Amino acid sequence: MKDFDLDSFLPYQLIVVATRLSREFSTLYHQKFGISVPEWRVVAHLAKSGTVSVREIHERVDMDKPKVSRAASRLEENGYVRKTQNPKDGRLVALTLTQKGQDMMAKLIPVADNFNAKLLDSLGPDADTFKAALKKLG
């Protein structure tokens, strides 16, 4: 049997790096606002897309629906999002950032942009190639 080199297996490399970077970034927003990684993904998506359903967020950020629902409930409890039922389909719950959520995102976006800029700087001239490769894989 041929040996398998896990360290050169691209999916493994990508998830290890993504997990490390997500953990590093999450310390920044958790310290300031007490939100978790799933909560960050929900509010970041809402900031970009406006009012959307839990189902749409689940599909867009590739998170289990129950995890999205729990994150949305915690965000609602903390006043960052508002939940409303879809009048045409009561099973669908729409999420919207509240003013408090918008204010939080106004403070978080520069932090995220700075984190991203540092990552891209660390790649130097390979940054554009790396972004293109990720886009091709995604």
Language model features with spans:
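A general lysine-centric signal
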Residues: 65-67, 83
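Base-recognition residues in the alpha-helical recognition helix of bacterial helix-turn-helix
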Residues: 12, 41-44, 69-70
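N-terminal helix-turn-helix DNA-binding core of bacterial DNA-binding proteins
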Residues: 23-64
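Residues within helix-turn-helix
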Residues: 54-55, 66, 73, 93
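N-terminal leader segment of winged-helix/HTH proteins
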Residues: 1-32
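Charged, amphipathic alpha-helical coiled-coil/dimerization segments
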Residues: 73-132
